[in-house]
Amino acid sequence: MNKNTWVIGFTLFAMFFGAGNLIFPPNLGLDSGQFFWPAILAFVLTGIGLPLLGVIVGALDKEGYIGALNKISPKFSILFLIIIYLTIGPLFAIPRTASTSFEMTITPIIHSNSSIALFIFTIIYFIVVLYICLNPSKLIDRIGSLLTPLLLITILAMIIKAYLDFSGNSAGKGNEALYHSNFSSFAEGFTQGYLTMDAIAAIAFSMIVVNAVKLTGITKTNQIFKQTLTAGLIAAIALIFIYISLGYIGNHMPVSDMKLNELKSHDRNIGTYLLTTMASTGFGSFGKYLLGIIVALACLTTACGLIVAVSEYFHRIVPKVSYKAFVLVFILMSFIIANQGLNAVISMSIPVLSIVYPVAITVVLLILIAKFIPTKRITQQIPVIIVFILSIFSVISKLGWLKINFIESLPLRAYSLEWFPVAIIATILGYLVGIFVKQDPIKYQQE
């Protein structure tokens, strides 16, 4: 394993390790109570396992996901990737990095969620993002060689001290309405992993990793695949350690019901409160500055990776508009949405993610299956269409816009996983239909 692989792996870790990766694990730990392990393992599965798979699958075709999705349908490829890039880009994920940075660096100092302070902070934040992203060829070096080691050192310092401070406590009772059995806790942890957005971000980051590997002089698809896999494993191991550590500490932190109600009444995110408490308990007044460094680095690296990925994709499909113009447009969009506040951004993203995630997971698994089992285009199209339609109606029913009894009666509906058995059945149906349709098996392009 050479130095370039380590740098690419650390860069991938830093791009994945953003806002959600900090605030969701301790919150999950607090809520899961006595059922911490099934919850955190499921969270790791969707928060790390699926993203790792997503990055690796993107290296199966020399054109990445663009080429692989074109095998399903060229029109679907464009539509799906536009939705993916906007979701992980200026509509939700990038604004969340800015609003999380504000809540965890500025709010503890000024003791207020001032809209004016948020406005000023996001201006400075996105100016820094703009500077880094205007030259994407240096992104890997700037993040992997400089920012990631600094991020790892600071996060490790906080985790070790917080573990010593709180590991002696027993686990709290948690949210017993959601976490009341091993299965319910696993299902809840699985769906909570959606909120990191990493499984769909992997589709974008895969292209950055593959291009970075190619820049090292590797051109053969099988070698690119191996290097991408190795870099992905480096990122995954680091993320697993941090997720479980933050979750375990959150699980053992004493937080009263009165305090939780107070946080909710002031529209404070509970995950950010837990992290702030970890830092201040371990390092006193210096703790909030240490945490500020961690958050700023984590969110900044993710925002830069996303801006570059989104801008490069849109420049590719609309070459008449320059890459730099897209960078400016998406940063402006992110700035506007970030000023709605962290909780508002998270709330807005949940319905969209509930539609996009099942389709994204289905697509990634179908591409992987097609690598090893002869698969026709119709075989992939059927489950994708069915899961997409089901996800839309599931969200409509869950929001109460229209109660759909059929949706509510599906297996695993209570855990928001009703799409999974349907996806399996639809895939089997796709293979059966494929027997009667004259199409050549899908073959992914090699160098």
UniProtKB/Swiss-Prot annotation:
Q: Name the UniProt key words of this record, in alphabetical order.
A: Amino-acid transport, Cell membrane, Membrane, Transmembrane, Transmembrane helix, Transport
Annotated membrane topology: Multi-pass membrane protein
Which one of the record's GO molecular function terms can you name? L-valine transmembrane transporter activity
A Pfam cross-reference name: Branch_AA_trans
Q: Where are the transmembrane segments?
A: 6-26, 40-60, 74-94, 114-134, 143-163, 193-213, 229-249, 290-310, 326-346, 350-370, 382-402, 417-437
Q: What is its main location?
A: membrane
One GO BP on record is: isoleucine transport
Subcellular localization is given as: Cell membrane
Q: Which domain of life is it from?
A: Bacteria
Q: Where does it sit, as one GO cellular component term?
A: plasma membrane
The text of the family note is: Belongs to the branched chain amino acid transporter family.
Q: Which PANTHER family match?
A: BRANCHED-CHAIN AMINO ACID CARRIER PROTEIN SAOUHSC_01411-RELATED (PTHR30588:SF7), BRANCHED-CHAIN AMINO ACID TRANSPORT SYSTEM 2 CARRIER PROTEIN (PTHR30588)
Biological function: Component of the transport system for branched-chain amino acids (leucine, isoleucine and valine), which is coupled to a proton motive force (Potential). Contributes to NaCl tolerance.
What this protein is called in its record is Putative branched-chain amino acid carrier protein SAR1419
Identify the species of origin.
Staphylococcus aureus (strain MRSA252)
